[in-house]
Curated annotation (Swiss-Prot):
Species of origin: Albidiferax ferrireducens (strain ATCC BAA-621 / DSM 15236 / T118) (Rhodoferax ferrireducens)
Listed name of the protein: Nucleotide-binding protein Rfer_2692
Family assignment from sequence similarity: Belongs to the YajQ family.
InterPro entries per the UniProt record, alphabetical: DUF520, UPF0234_N, YajQ-like_sf
NCBIfam families assigned: PRK05412.1 (NF003819)
Pfam families with a match to the protein in the record: DUF520
Domain of life: Bacteria
Amino acid sequence: MPSFDTVCEASMVDVKHAVENTTKEITTRFDFKGTPAAIELKDKEITLTGDADFQLSQIEDILRNKLTKRSVDVRFLDKGEVQKIGGDKVKQVIKVRNGIETELAKKIQRLIKDSKIKVQAAIQESKLRVTGAKRDDLQAAMALIKKDITEVPLSFDNFRD
């Protein structure tokens, strides 16, 4: 029975390279000289550190540009709150989304059921598997998901006949 998986995964290698390039640019830019501006990647969290909110937004803009150059969708980034740390410093944690959240998976599953396309959707941990009798039905389900779900970058893999 033909099937495919719907996933939401960023290339962590490209994210790492974008963070490294952002670090290089921060160290060479004149407006960041003598400031504690920094960016750091640990697991799937990017930590921005700076003097003020304005500096954090500049670092974030640099990061977004570097990610875009590496073809990583910026919708993978989930911004956290700006926190004050010792002195005048502030930090912000940005999480890199990896996997489809349960709520979104249920929304996609409901969308497929309501569309009356003859396919079944099953939630499997951080991905959604869609199976159907015909390849055309699966392609129709893909088109429906691409059209209606825009808040996160979804991709399709593991297409089997």
